């Protein structure tokens, strides 16, 4: 699994808590609120789809009410997931339900666990990656939260305001609340053994057990659907017209030439009396296009993800880099619409290999070949390119991201 170099990879188990009855949301023929339809799909399906497509997720366990097996089966019947999804029955309280999910994961060999409310469908991979980075850097517990912005009042039993509470250092907790797996399992087991059943979230159990909890920035949209009006607003949000967010990213790269037997450009090997010098396979075209894709979502550059100082990338095929960038784009809601590469070289001739290069780009990016362009020009014997000392590439990627009217 590829990770940013600043963090250790995690193997995450996901506990989705879906055993509640949701009485405040009112009764419905669709069942509890996690099975209500928003944007044409049940709430719980939106939640699961976000986790299913997250690279670090290794096992998902959904904790459901014993009476909801048919509801869950109906809701999930169209789900196709490479990440295993299983269900277990929950208990009388959220705390008991979470413990049931944790016990299921005990023999699944996960390093960490993310515990999430099924009725919080509006989180994204940016938040998950933020949490994973803290966990990978050694935090035993990570809580996404938003600073409290409303003015807080304290009232007496008669409903009269008695004080204004300072908002300083106050946060509204969200999920997924995330932990080193064995640590939070042990804390939950100890809480159950001691008869404590009044914890309202998992971070509270961690605090009680003496586990330090690190706060990371949550997302404003990551709200819990509690009332009937929440579900109606969520449906409106997902059903609103989709507006395109078209972004263009540019990338540039250059590699020196040295004596050799050929160069690799756009994943195609071209016999030549020189080769490109570099830490990886030095595919200057794919390196430029990787940067262009990352630029469309502010995800840094190729050196951030694959530093040349890291020996694991020595001689690596640049296919790894471009497919990684394309995956990041898709995880962040992007659709790659076009990829254009311009090669600047005196030799070798690109024309005879252009269609093979376009086919490789189509394969790596998962888009139609008509959306892939490869062009070449000389530098009119000017500069380092003109002296056949190197090859340069300029790439442009067009990606459509989507956002919704509120």
From Swiss-Prot:
EC number: 2.7.7.60, 4.6.1.12
One example of a Gene Ontology biological process annotation: isopentenyl diphosphate biosynthetic process, methylerythritol 4-phosphate pathway
Site feature: Transition state stabilizer: 24, 33, 279, 378
Superkingdom assignment: Bacteria
Region listing for 2-C-methyl-D-erythritol 2,4-cyclodiphosphate synthase, in residue ranges: 247-406
Signal peptide (UniProt feature, chain positions): none
Pathway: Isoprenoid biosynthesis; isopentenyl diphosphate biosynthesis via DXP pathway; isopentenyl diphosphate from 1-deoxy-D-xylulose 5-phosphate: step 2/6; Isoprenoid biosynthesis; isopentenyl diphosphate biosynthesis via DXP pathway; isopentenyl diphosphate from 1-deoxy-D-xylulose 5-phosphate: step 4/6
Gene Ontology terms, MF aspect: 2-C-methyl-D-erythritol 2,4-cyclodiphosphate synthase activity; 2-C-methyl-D-erythritol 4-phosphate cytidylyltransferase activity; metal ion binding
Site entry (Positions MEP for the nucleophilic attack), positions: 167, 224
Pfam families with a match to the protein in the record: IspD, YgbB
Region (2-C-methyl-D-erythritol 4-phosphate cytidylyltransferase) location: 1-246
Reactions mediated catalytically: 2-C-methyl-D-erythritol 4-phosphate + CTP + H(+) = 4-CDP-2-C-methyl-D-erythritol + diphosphate; 4-CDP-2-C-methyl-D-erythritol 2-phosphate = 2-C-methyl-D-erythritol 2,4-cyclic diphosphate + CMP
Cofactor(s) named in the record: a divalent metal cation
Family in the record: In the N-terminal section; belongs to the IspD/TarI cytidylyltransferase family. IspD subfamily.
NCBIfam families: ispD, ispF, PRK09382.1
Name the UniProt record assigns to this protein: Bifunctional enzyme IspD/IspF
Organism lineage: Bacteria, Pseudomonadati, Pseudomonadota, Alphaproteobacteria, Hyphomicrobiales
Gene: ispDF
């Amino acid at each position: 699994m590829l990770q940013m170099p600043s963090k250790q990879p995690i193997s995450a188990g996901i506990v989705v808590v879906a055993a509640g009855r949701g009485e405040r949301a009112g009764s419905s023929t669709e069942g509890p609120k996690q099975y209500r339809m928003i944007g044409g799909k049940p709430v719980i399906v939106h939640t699961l789809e976000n986790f299913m497509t997250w690279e670090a997720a290794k096992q998902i366990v959904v904790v459901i009410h014993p009476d909801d097996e048919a509801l869950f089966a109906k809701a999930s019947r169209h789900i196709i997931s490479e990440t295993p999804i299983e269900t277990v029955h929950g208990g009388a309280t959220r705390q008991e339900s979470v413990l049931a999910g944790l016990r299921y994961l005990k023999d699944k060999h996960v390093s960490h666990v993310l515990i999430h409310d099924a009725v919080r469908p509006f989180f994204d991979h940016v938040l998950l990656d933020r949490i994973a980075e803290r966990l990978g850097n050694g935090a035993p517990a990570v809580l996404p939260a938003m600073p409290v912005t409303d003015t807080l009042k304290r009232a007496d039993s008669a409903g009269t305001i008695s004080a204004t509470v300072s908002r300083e250092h106050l946060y509204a907790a969200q999920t997924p609340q995330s932990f080193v797996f064995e640590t939070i399992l042990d804390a939950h087991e100890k809480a159950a053994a001691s008869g404590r059943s009044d914890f309202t979230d998992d971070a509270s159990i961690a605090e009680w057990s003496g586990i330090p909890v690190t706060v990371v920035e949550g997302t404003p949209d990551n709200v819990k659907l509690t009332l009937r009006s929440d579900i109606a607003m969520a449906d409106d949000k997902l059903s609103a017209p989709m507006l395109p967010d078209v972004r263009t990213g540019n990338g540039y790269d250059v590699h020196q030439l040295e004596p050799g037997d050929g160069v690799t450009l756009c994943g195609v090997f071209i016999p030549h009396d020189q080769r490109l010098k570099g830490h990886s396979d030095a595919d200057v075209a794919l390196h430029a296009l990787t940067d262009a894709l990352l630029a469309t979502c502010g995800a840094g550059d190729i050196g951030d993800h694959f530093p040349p100082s890291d020996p694991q990338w020595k001689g690596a095929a640049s296919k790894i880099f471009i497919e990684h960038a394309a995956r990041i784009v898709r995880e962040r809601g992007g659709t790659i619409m076009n990829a254009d590469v311009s090669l600047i070289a005196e030799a070798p001739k690109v024309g005879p290999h252009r269609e093979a290069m376009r086919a490789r780009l189509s394969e790596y990016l998962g888009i139609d070949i008509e959306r892939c362009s490869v062009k070449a020009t000389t530098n009119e014997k000017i500069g380092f390119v003109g002296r056949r000392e190197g090859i340069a590439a300029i790439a442009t990627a067009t990606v459509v991201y989507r956002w919704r009217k509120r």
